[in-house]
Swiss-Prot record:
Designated name of the protein: Putative pterin-4-alpha-carbinolamine dehydratase
Highest taxon, organism lineage: Bacteria
One Pfam family per UniProt: Pterin_4a
Record's keyword terms, sorted: Lyase
EC code: 4.2.1.96
Length: 98
């Protein structure tokens, strides 16, 4: 999987394919808040996302408070966003929709 930093146009294209994700301040990360009906659903989402992240060897910055999960994705080694961030974001969206 490519860990090459994406340019502005590639980032805009990637965001156009992702519901509810936003470019974080500074433009080097994307962020989304997921809200579930309860803690069990939030934790189940995090478990599925963690397994996908491990498989991709790409790990999110996230916090969980009760039924809310805030996620920030960036590729620290590349100093910005890469294809991995968008791939993991798409997987997270799919898991949240289940």
């Amino acid at each position: 999987m490519a860990r090459q930093k994406l340019d502005r146009k590639e980032i805009e294209n990637g965001l156009s394919e992702l519901d509810e994700w936003e470019l974080a301040e500074g433009g080097n990360a994307i962020h989304r808040r997921f809200v579930f009906s309860n803690f069990n659903e939030a934790f189940g989402f995090m478990t599925r996302a963690a397994l996908a992240a491990e498989k991709l060897d790409h790990h999110p910055e996230w916090t969980n408070v009760y039924k809310t999960v805030d996620v920030t994705l960036t590729t620290h080694a590349s100093g910005g966003l890469t294809e991995l961030d968008f791939k993991l974001a798409k997987k997270m969206n799919a898991y949240a929709a289940k």
